[in-house]
Amino acid sequence: MDGFEAALEMIKPHATGLVCGSVLSIAFNTVARRNPDARRLVAGTPLYIYAVAMIFQALVFAPAAYSAWSRWNFDPQWMKEGWTTARGTVNVDPMGEKKRLERVYLYALFGYMIKDMWIFRTDVLFFAHHLICLFGIAAFFAIPAGIGAFVVGGTVLELGNFTYNIVLLVGKDSGKTVPAKVKHYAECLYATCMPLSNLVGGVMFVWFAGFPRLEGTPWVTGLGTAWFALIAGREYVHLSRSVPYFAKHFKAKRALAKANAEASAVAAKLKKKT
């Protein structure tokens, strides 16, 4: 229990930030859904959910991660630091200026996960996914190293989710108002970016697992189980969508090419007869 209690003591100072992040995220959802058209269902989900998610992914997480790392001139060592270390400096205040952007990122990510929990309370997979994420985020307030790696790795995964939101909005199952080319390009974007996001996220965790103060610890085992379970779920969804789509797409292209070849052969024969 000592380790668990110590972790709780490290998380406690962040309680206000986590509550603020959650309240602001829920408020963002509330404002976004005020327009009746924003509550229109797309692939079974209200349109505003996609809009809010994509705003967080592109305009909150990515810029926050960039800003946090850029403060250290993109030094890879930043990814290995804990809450009390910074470029070899020890006894850094976790609630101080040096860790401000990292804290804000995690508060925003926590609120982002909280905001839809009630809305999707009956969706077991969604609820379980977000619950695992919430426990993982909380754990990172107590972890001895690798804060930056989580900030960047989490952003990489969220950018993969960004392409998933795009494909749900304008992909193969979208309405007739979306041009066929747009649908296909959306499917191509998702089919490329989601597995790339999963690959980078997986490689980053393997690197993370070897950090000093983390290698061989329960942190790696526990967080690794959750991390790779989430990646496996994401990849399952990706393959379930992209493999049938592109199998059908290329089959149609081959059939069209065959039909064109046969038509050309018939035309050539007719030309010879004349």
Q: Would you name each region that the model predicts?
A:
Residues 1-157, 170-274:
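Membrane-helix and juxtamembrane interface regions of eukaryotic multi-pass membrane proteins
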Residues 155-156, 160-165:
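Functional transmembrane alpha-helices
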